[in-house]
Amino acid sequence: MQWRALVLGLVLLRLGLHAVLWLVFGLGPSMGFYQRFPLSFGFQRLRDPDGSGPVGPPGGPAWLHRPRRGTEGRLETPPEPGPTPGPGVCGPAHWGYALGGGGCGPDEYERRYSGAFPPQLRAQMRDLARGMFVFGYDNYMAHAFPQDELNPIYCRGRGPDRGDPSNLNINDVLGNYSLTLVDALDTLAIMGNSSEFQKAVKLVINTVSFDKDSTVQVFEATIRVLGSLLSAHRIITDSKQPFGDMTIEDYDNELLYMAHDLAVRLLPAFENTKTGIPYPRVNLKTGVPPDSNNETCTAGAGSLLVEFGILSRLLGDSTFEWVARRAVKALWNLRSNDTGLLGNVVNIQTGHWVGKQSGLGAGLDSFYEYLLKSYILFGEKEDLEMFNAAYQSIQSYLRRGREACNEGEGDPPLYVNVNMFSGQLMNTWIDSLQAFFPGLQVLIGDVEDAICLHAFYYAIWKRYGALPERYNWQLQAPDVLFYPLRPELVESTYLLYQATKNPFYLHVGMDILQSLEKYTKVKCGYATLHHVIDKSKEDRMESFFLSETCKYLYLLFDEENPVHKSGTRYMFTTEGHIISVDKRLRELPWKEFFSEDGERDQEEKFVHRPKSQELRVINSSSNCNRVPDERRYSLPLKSIYMRQIDQMVGLI
């Protein structure tokens, strides 16, 4: 009997020890047994057993390897398996709970990002964004106007580089037409500063002329100047005046006539090209320069339709929309028959692709953006059809990583640069302009995928306090180190917040605001970062800092802004200029239109007339309701995947 009692005692002791171990290591919403318990536990081991680096296939992330594609253009099976959530009491990973050990309850990501964002803090950040704009704008007016840009370090103005016509970085943008003032007009209105808006409009009318011996890039003049003039004109003539009284006494459509004058001076770019694709540059007085380059980028030639289309429909003159639409169709018809992709540089005379790289960044970005936004504004069915086909090709050939953003194994989704004909990887870098793409995905309702790509760019921002112009994801280091105050990450942050109302994006915006204040503010404004690591600066403040970066930051924190509350649907151009989406822009004021070959088509054959409810825009509640309610109160991306992304950019 004694040996039986001894055996029973040992069994009970063993069961008791198991119970204690289970209570210590197994309970809690974020804990679970891992295969190598008790040395490692948690949902996922994101590093090699020796802790030396992220788990992944030899030679780098699975992004290097082309995935198999399913029928919908997504991954049919994931790439090389990454770390897997461990078994245990919690099952799959949940939003915002501990990763890799460290106790029960919310983890570091949950604590930092998912707490309430108090109204007082929101108001403080809104005022900081407004103060940032005012500081830059006031210093431009005091030290630089009527020149194009402000040099914020030495407090002086900058115009075209007359001594070096080959300095395209400056001369493509600066046309000696008070660029920063023109570009900032609608930001003044959105911030409710009616007196300064009215003063600025009168200054533009009375002092700005396009009769200048300036050779400018057609794309830059269109999005920065033409787009701003049209936006400000629409604000002035809006009968509802949602931003306050922005009317101008005795206003006689002067901004619209100025926009027409500029567009007429840009039209020679579309002449004498065998493809209909425009020359990249024109002289505002003399037309296309005799030594003009026959090569242009896809975005530069194919991102004119929004501004040119608005102008045509306001004037009742089809010329501008026709030339812009012809250029889009010409580029579209040159896409690869095998992949459906476009390259980034084309010869306008031969239609030969000089640059065969296909990606989402420089050279292609706004081409895709304007296919969708042209449909939203004008309702032309062919624009939506082109966009849907392009998006399908992007998903099929550019997207790498696991199929779902918030589920499964493998690397996080990323869009890479490939050869337009083969779909094969061309390099291992991405550029900062690509950070616009999550915002575009929000517009089409692909919010889940947008969340992951945005998180990747935000992780890069966290590492450097800015976005390097080009980042090598294989080397985990910048290839091009400067940051010219670009708005793309801020834009996507704002649009994702509008879609999800998740406070995470307010925290992201606060991080960006504080980084800009800390690293870029100088004596007379905000300066380009020459080097994102050592934070050395260049003496330049580009106009898009006031027209986009400050605007999106302000709107992110201004919940009561008329943009969000007036009941009017708005869309932003690629330069951040606000345009109301209304019936007038979806109706052609002319009875005939031109087909691609220059012959006239009857309107009924050319134009699709969607009903208003067919057009989906960002402040449509039906789009925002696609996001699960859980996402409004928890992290938009599970902590396990946030940590994975942070590790993959070398942040941890």
From Swiss-Prot:
One cellular component term from this protein's GO annotations in UniProt: endoplasmic reticulum
Domain of life from the UniProt record: Eukaryota
Molecular-function annotations in GO: calcium ion binding; mannosyl-oligosaccharide 1,2-alpha-mannosidase activity; misfolded protein binding
Gene3D superfamilies in the cross-refs: 1.50.10.10
Keywords: Endoplasmic reticulum, Glycoprotein, Membrane, Signal-anchor, Transmembrane, Transmembrane helix, Unfolded protein response
The keyword Transport is annotated on this UniProt entry: no
Segments on the Lumenal side according to the record's topology features: 26-652
Subcellular location: Endoplasmic reticulum membrane
Coiled coil: none
InterPro entries assigned: 6hp_glycosidase-like_sf, EDEM1/2/3, Glyco_hydro_47, Seven-hairpin_glycosidases
Topology Cytoplasmic: residue spans: 1-4
TM stretches of this protein: 5-25
Membrane topology: Single-pass type II membrane protein
Chief location of this protein within or outside the cell: endoplasmic reticulum
GO terms under biological process: carbohydrate metabolic process; ERAD pathway; mannoprotein catabolic process; positive regulation of retrograde protein transport, ER to cytosol; protein targeting to ER; response to unfolded protein; trimming of terminal mannose on C branch; ubiquitin-dependent protein catabolic process
Cited Pfam families: Glyco_hydro_47
Glycan attachment residues as annotated in the record: 176, 193, 294, 337
Function: Extracts misfolded glycoproteins, but not glycoproteins undergoing productive folding, from the calnexin cycle. It is directly involved in endoplasmic reticulum-associated degradation (ERAD) and targets misfolded glycoproteins for degradation in an N-glycan-independent manner, probably by forming a complex with SEL1L. It has low mannosidase activity, catalyzing mannose trimming from Man8GlcNAc2 to Man7GlcNAc2.
Entry's family note: Belongs to the glycosyl hydrolase 47 family.
Subunit structure: Interacts with DERL2 and DERL3. Binds to SEL1L. Interacts with DNAJC10.
Protein name as it appears in the record: ER degradation-enhancing alpha-mannosidase-like protein 1
Native source species: Mus musculus
Gene expressing this chain: Edem1
